[in-house]
Amino acid sequence: MNIREAIAAVVARRDLTQAEAASVMEEIMNGTATPAQIAAFLTALHIKGETDAEIAGMAAVMREKATHVYFDGPVIDTCGTGGDGAHTFNISTTAAFVAAGAGLTVAKHGNRAMSSVCGSADVLEGLGVQIELDAEGVARCLRDAGIGFMFAPKFHPAMRFAGPVRREIGIRTVFNILGPLTNPARARYQVLGVASAALAEKLANALSRLDTVHALVVHGDGGVDELTLSGPNLIFEVRAGHALRQMIVAPEDVGLERAPREALRGGDVAYNVALVRAILSGEDRGPRRDVVLLNAAAALVAGDVAPDLATGVKMARASIDSGRALERLHRMIAVSRGEA
């Protein structure tokens, strides 16, 4: 199916198969689709609503076109789709260091702020990490620091064909949710935060169509794209060879206290950098630490090193209290800057 046929099908509200969506994405990613065709397709798909099969087909092509990072061993990614308007601090980025301190190798894939004030790239840069590394530089961080960061624009060169169109049409499209599914290090373990419950289930089903080994797709209380402390959280567990499993987990279920969403608010880059340092150093021991423990626990479960979230919280706490989480940050800064 070519993109003109796909536009006609989607306008008629017909869902594409995974293979058809992949075929269209090939045209977009190799530059043969025109800007007008890309805009028409993305807009029509947005109006119809993307299916998990369509998302998976497009993600598979985007993964293949990415500049790959090669690492000999399993890696996990922790990220969210954004767009929740909650203005929390960089929870998943902080949790990544805690998970790394507990033994996981974290291949974080992210960008600068889109809908927030401070994205993962912004806070890491503020912490002193060199964020614009090439594939070998990231692989070196994974090997020597246990955590690496892939700055999305640098690893998805084929996005140059769709990027200008996305900016011009100015609406959220399927590309807003493809980023977290297209890790250049081919992370087969993942924690993916989603602001919409319906989209969370859809992305969980999309991950099950890809080569995922174990993932937790989480939707926080109040529509946050992280596990949060304000109430019950919805979790979809994706495990290779198993049916999708749905869970509801409240903070008290894993030994943590509830806290209002306002307690997790972030600020500008300088503010969030100070927060990350305070949490990893053990100085901040309030709800911001607790929400990091909860999200790091999810990574430890998805990464198959913790049997359940309650155990994961204990392991995450030990990662901070032992100094291992902060050491991962210091190590990542040094390795990324060529100082180690």
UniProtKB/Swiss-Prot annotation:
Record-linked InterPro entries: Anthranilate_Pribosyl_Tfrase, Glycosyl_Trfase_fam3, Glycosyl_Trfase_fam3_N_dom, Glycosyl_Trfase_fam3_N_dom_sf, Nuc_phospho_transferase
Residues annotated as binding Mg(2+) 1: 92, 226
Catalytic reaction(s) noted: N-(5-phospho-beta-D-ribosyl)anthranilate + diphosphate = 5-phospho-alpha-D-ribose 1-diphosphate + anthranilate
Gene Ontology cellular-component terms listed: cytosol
Name the UniProt record assigns to this protein: Anthranilate phosphoribosyltransferase
NCBIfam families: trpD
Cofactor note: Binds 2 magnesium ions per monomer.
Listed PANTHER family: ANTHRANILATE PHOSPHORIBOSYLTRANSFERASE
Native species: Chloroflexus aggregans (strain MD-66 / DSM 9485)
Role played: Catalyzes the transfer of the phosphoribosyl group of 5-phosphorylribose-1-pyrophosphate (PRPP) to anthranilate to yield N-(5'-phosphoribosyl)-anthranilate (PRA).
Cysteine disulfide partners in this protein: none
Keywords: Amino-acid biosynthesis, Aromatic amino acid biosynthesis, Glycosyltransferase, Magnesium, Metal-binding, Transferase, Tryptophan biosynthesis
Binding-site positions, anthranilate 1: 80, 111
One record GO biological process: L-tryptophan biosynthetic process
Residues that bind 5-phospho-alpha-D-ribose 1-diphosphate: 80, 83-84, 88, 90-93, 108-116, 120
EC number annotated for this UniProt entry: 2.4.2.18
GO MF entries: anthranilate phosphoribosyltransferase activity; magnesium ion binding
Family named by the database record: Belongs to the anthranilate phosphoribosyltransferase family.
Gene3D superfamilies: Nucleoside phosphorylase/phosphoribosyltransferase catalytic domain, Transferase, Pyrimidine Nucleoside Phosphorylase, Chain C
The organism's taxonomic lineage, starting at the top: Bacteria, Bacillati, Chloroflexota, Chloroflexia, Chloroflexales
